[in-house]
Amino acid sequence: MQLLLSSVCMALTSAVIGFAYYQKQQFYPAVVYITKSNASMGVIYIQFFVIVFMFGKLLSKIFLGTLRAAEFEHLLERFWYALTETCLAFTVFRDDFNPRFVALFTVLLFLKSFHWLAEERVDFMERSPVLGWLFHIRVGSLLTVLGILDYVLLIHAYNSTLVRGPTVQLVFGFEYAILLTVIASTAIKYVLHAAEMRTDTPWENKAVFLLYTELVIGLIKVVLYILFVVIMAKIYALPMFVFRPMFFTIRNFRKALNDVIMSRRAIRNMNTLYPDATPEELRQSDNICIICREDMVNHSKKLPCGHIFHTTCLRSWFQRQQTCPTCRLNILRTPTVNSTAMPRQGDEAVAAAAGNPIPAAAGVQPAGGVPPPAPTAVVDGNQARADVNVAGGQALPPNFADLFGDASGLPNGLPNLAGLQIPPPPVMPMISPFMIPPHFGYLTPLPPPPIPQDLTNFTDEELRAMEGLQRDHIVQRLKLLQNINLMLDSAGIMMSQYQSLSARLQLTAVTPATAVNGSADSSVYDMPSTSATAMAQLETHQVTPTAAASSASPTMPAEKVTIEDLGADADEDDIPSTATEAVSIPNSDADFEENSSELGELRKRRLKFLEERNKSAATNERTTAE
């Protein structure tokens, strides 16, 4: 594609030059003809850009070799922004717009492109494990050539401004000054990376030098941009084309300054606040530093989160980030919870030997059994932190055994909750009983600690000793409240299940009547009681023998169903008679829908009768037993 475009441009240029020479027959008149023709100048400009592009490809092959995909992508992104800024610069210097002006801006964009490629290649140098001598020759030669060109063009613009006054060379001088700072920063990075590659161990101070280099270069760029904007605003107009690069320069300088301040603070905290890792801690944890992937023998630091790293690796890491490399904990915050990387033997004994700051009163069990916060265990170098937010009422579910073991040390085994004002814990939403299995043995928690029978006999000192004022006591109260809430929720769910089960058993406790027409003794009570179809079958099959006999004859009208047919023989006075009420036995779904109200009333009366009979039978049994 590139070869085709180059061939087309070359053919058009040859045609334009040949046509001009054919018209004028002399060199000078032909040149004048081409310069006066806009179409001819357009073709010449295109050919000039093609030549510059091909020359750039040649220099890229010489100094850089094959470009990587990331380098080419970043080059295109920056080039389009630079081209837009160049078009804005044309509007400021529209009076000076001529072929020489276009050529100068083309050369500027050409040099900017190679500055960007050199910067990308030096950054890649830090990530590449093996670099040959050809790489160093290419990068060193490119940096040298670019530095010389920037300096020469800067001096030329400076001299031109002194001789001719403020012209367009002022803009080019400023641009080449910025490019000179860029090439200086790139050269310093290259020297630092090359020096580190010559050593077997990582260079500890390289990150510090890089950080301060970015800070100084950023400061110089900010000063240059501010001076250029002030000068251009006084002489020409406000230079809109430098606002975008000036904004990014100020932002990068601010970031570099913030990195310097934060890194110094982090390193100071590391040297003063964080203890050195002991050999025992190194043995109990994974003694491989995840930054350099080497074993940690000595000179290691333990962060507040419990992770251990080399001191030199942490110093280099803190130059860029002020967080733990493993868990991303912000190490600049003041540590509030003392954590350990792995639980050690003897911690429980030390915690049990800790005394209670509140003196025990006479006749009261000492409250020294209240343990301090247990050390947080971290598995595989990761910290499992459980922060109790008293203000928000949020806490992790506690262990019942640990809770009641801690509370046993207080008088009567229960801390007093009086005077503690905390928001209620979040209420667990009630779950439908049909969505939970019928077995709930695993939901039943341990019983709460025993409650003192009479609190009025306790003195003020005893009550204060029971209540407690330390963080441990508050945490235990919150845990106890959460356990109570869990037990209440479990009780509510169990009661819902019991109610639904008892209602179902009342429906299935009735013995089915004799089958109609000698049918098999299949029971309809095994079906769910909530099904409308099952209810219809239940009412159809629960008719008395009299009703069954009447239903056997299809030509006979519907018989009357009385309470005697349901089995009433002793308590007729308690049940209102239904001898005068005629109820049709449904033979289809339509008949059942028409007589649903009568069947429902009949069913209610029958259930009431069964309840009364069961009560009387139970009373007779108790009387007989007495």
Swiss-Prot record:
Description of its domains: The RING-type zinc finger is required for E3 ligase activity.
Any one of the GO CC terms: endoplasmic reticulum
Side of membrane Cytoplasmic, spans: 60-96, 150-167, 244-626
One annotated GO biological process: ERAD pathway
Subcellular location: Endoplasmic reticulum membrane
EC number from the UniProt entry: 2.3.2.27
Job description of the protein: Acts as an E3 ubiquitin-protein ligase which accepts ubiquitin specifically from endoplasmic reticulum-associated UBC7 E2 ligase and transfers it to substrates, promoting their degradation. Component of the endoplasmic reticulum quality control (ERQC) system also called ER-associated degradation (ERAD) involved in ubiquitin-dependent degradation of misfolded endoplasmic reticulum proteins. Also promotes the degradation of normal but naturally short-lived proteins. Protects cells from ER stress-induced apoptosis.
Transmembrane helix listed as a keyword: yes
Database matches in PROSITE patterns: ZF_RING_2
TM ranges: 39-59, 97-117, 129-149, 168-188, 223-243
Signal peptide interval: 1-15
Region of interest (Disordered), ranges: 569-600
Reactions that this protein is recorded to catalyse: S-ubiquitinyl-[E2 ubiquitin-conjugating enzyme]-L-cysteine + [acceptor protein]-L-lysine = [E2 ubiquitin-conjugating enzyme]-L-cysteine + N(6)-ubiquitinyl-[acceptor protein]-L-lysine
Pathway: Protein modification; protein ubiquitination
UniProt KW keywords: Endoplasmic reticulum, Membrane, Metal-binding, Signal, Transferase, Transmembrane, Transmembrane helix, Ubl conjugation pathway, Zinc, Zinc-finger
Zn-finger region bounds: RING-type: 289-328
Bilayer disposition of the protein: Multi-pass membrane protein
A Pfam family annotated for this UniProt entry: zf-RING_2
Name by which UniProt lists this protein: E3 ubiquitin-protein ligase HRD1
Organism, scientific name: Drosophila melanogaster
EC top class named in words: transferase
Top-level taxon in the UniProt lineage: Eukaryota
Gene Ontology molecular function, alphabetical: p53 binding; ubiquitin protein ligase activity; zinc ion binding
Main location: endoplasmic reticulum
Gene: sip3
